[in-house]
Amino acid sequence: VTNVDWFFISHRLPIALNAIQQGYEVYLLSRDTGRKQFLQGKGIRFIDIPFDRSGSNPLHELKCIFQLYTNYKKYRPNIIHHVTLKAALLGSVAAKLSGQHHVVNAISGLGYNFTNGRNGILQKLIRTLIRIAFKSKSFSFILQNPDDVGMIKGFNLVPSSHIFLIKGSGVDLNEFVFSQAPGKTQLKVLFPARILLDKGVMEFIDAAKLLQKRFIGKVKFILAGDCDKENLAVLGEEKLRSLLVDDYIEWIGYQAQMFPIYTDSDIVVLPSYREGLPKSL
């Protein structure tokens, strides 16, 4: 269960395919953005759940919980694997209501809302929801950074033996193979991520601006990623464009094939908040 199909393909598809090879039936409950047929062709049973990643409408969230509950009751899965915070929160509530106990909540990062100094109404609401949804002796957590482990342990939600720390989601080394640095006269520094505050986009741009007088013409800072408008931490496209500098800070948008971008870069930077080892690094 995850918010959106493209994230599943990017971060969890190999796990699902391996489970199918071992004889499991794999159902994906996610929002369909056009990848349903592709995933069904891989042997995955796709159920469309209209998750809203911005989460601004409580009635819509209740609708998603009800749809998850209905499917959990109907299919009685042996294991429910929630991926991302939103899916884990809504899915855990649905799992409790449907009597499902074998739940794994895999959260790659609690994100910008849990960085130091952020303690507003939204943060307090999310913490309250975490305490309600995740409290269960039978639930397990897979987390990717020590800060999140400390937070979940501090809530006393599950036994400590049910909390696992991993270093990242991993990459396919058959696709991303070693290559020599380009060795060009103009150094290229790459930011390979969505244009989000919790990915450190402003830190990247600010660092580039600090070096501008010394290195313009010698270095190019490149941002490769889309402005994820559904994410609360997005830096808007208009604001981003106002920060670009010709032939120095460049935005190339979403790139379906990242390997050529990596091989053409000398340095890769991702100053993100509350992540483990990001897949892009």
Protein language model features and the residues they cover:
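Nucleotide-activated donor-binding/catalytic signature segment of Leloir-type glycosyltransferases, i.e.
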Residues: 225, 234-253
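Short His-centered aromatic/hydrophobic patch
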Residues: 82-88, 107
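Aromatic "clamp/platform" in nucleotide-sugar-dependent glycosyltransferases that forms part
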Residues: 254, 273
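Membrane-proximal helix-turn-helix segments that form the acceptor-binding/catalytic region
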Residues: 15-22, 66-69, 123-142
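N-terminal strand-loop element at the rim of the active site
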Residues: 2-59, 151, 165, 227-229
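A short hydrophobic beta-strand element within the catalytic core of glycosyltransferases
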Residues: 268-269
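Donor nucleotide-sugar binding/catalytic pocket of nucleotide-sugar-dependent glycosyltransferases
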Residues: 47-48, 127-178, 188-191
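Conserved donor-binding/catalytic core segment of Leloir-type glycosyltransferases
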Residues: 180-199, 204-209, 221-222
